[in-house]
Each structure stands twice: as C-alpha cells, then as structure tokens.
C-alpha cells in the first residue's frame, strides 16, 4: 500500500467508510516501516505519522465506541431494569399467586374441615336425638307394659279374691246344704218314722235354689252335693 493507491481510492470514492481509509493509511505506514531501514528518513517519518495516526485512530475509535456504546449501555441498562422489573413483577406475581393459592387452599381446607365437623356434629346430634327418641319410646313401652302387667296382676288378684269368695260361699252353701240335707234327712227320717207311707218332696223354689247353688260350686263340690241330694226326691 502506498500514497498513490490511497489517493486514487479517494478520487474515485473507493472508501465507503472512514475506517477503510484509516486502515489503508495505517497499512501504508506499516509497510514503510517494514520495507525501509531504521536509519532512513522514510522510516522515521513513517514511524512518527503512524504514532499520530494511532493516537487519532484510538481517539476516534474511543469516541465512536463511546457514542455507540451509550445507546448500548442505555439499552442494556433499560433491558436490565426491565428484566429486573419483570423478574420482580414475576416473582411478586408468582409469590402473590402462590400466597393466594396457599390462602385459597388453606381457606378451602378450613371450610372443608368446618363442613366436615359440621356434618359430623349434625350426624352425631341427629343420631343422639334418634337415640333419645328411641329410648323414650322404649321407656314408654316399658312403662305401658309394666302398667299392663300391674293391671293384669290386679285383675288376677281380684279374680283370685273372687274365686276365694266364691269358694267360701260355695263351702258355706255346701255346709248349709249339708246341714239342710242332714236336717231334711233327719226330718224325713223322723217323718218316715212317724209316717212310713209318705216321703219329703222338693218344691219348685227349693229345686231352683239348689240348682243355682250347684251351678256356683266347683266340680268337686257339685259331685259332693249331688251325692247328698236324694235321687228319689221329686
């Protein structure tokens, strides 16, 4: 690379950017330093120009990098801020949703337990009420049965008393019948002794009274009374 080539590129608009031009100038100075002796004036001038060129190039590069870096830094900062905000919002939303879900599940479990306890208490109370009703009904039935048993016992006692009274009456009637029979037999015997041709006859009223008394007696007493009564009496 030499100065004539660089001049031709400048005349023909061969360089599209300044970077291409400075690259050829730097290459020209490096070639001058490479292909010339250190003691030659071309090498000295090329070294001096290359030094200034590099300073200028570094200054321009730094300036361009700074100018181009500012938007990049701003963009990076903005992107970083956005990412941080997004992450923060995401974490916040995530935590909020997590807490919300946790609270929702906690409330749901609490309601579920509350409903479960409510149903358990309701069923327990319902069963307890049914047991109380059944116990009351059983107690009432037992009381009714006891009352019926007491009434039956009282009726049995009354029947026994009536039977005893009937037995006493029957025994008394039997005794009376016996005595009357004996008296009648004695009277009949006396009458027969006095009048041998006549017998004692029962009147209709006596016969009716005897039958009524016989009907009130027990079977044993009836047989005894029938044995006492004269079968030949009309």
Curated annotation (Swiss-Prot):
Residues 1-60 form the Bromo domain. It comes from the Eukaryota. Keywords: Bromodomain. Residues 134-209 are annotated as: Disordered. Gene3D superfamilies: Bromodomain-like. Residues 134-194 have a biased composition (Low complexity). Pfam families: BET, Bromodomain. The keyword Transferase does not apply. The keyword Nucleotide-binding does not apply. InterPro entries: Bromodomain, Bromodomain-like_sf, Env_Response_Regulator, NET_dom. This is Bromodomain-containing protein DDB_G0271118. It comes from Dictyostelium discoideum (Social amoeba). The lineage of its organism: Eukaryota, Amoebozoa, Evosea, Eumycetozoa, Dictyostelia.
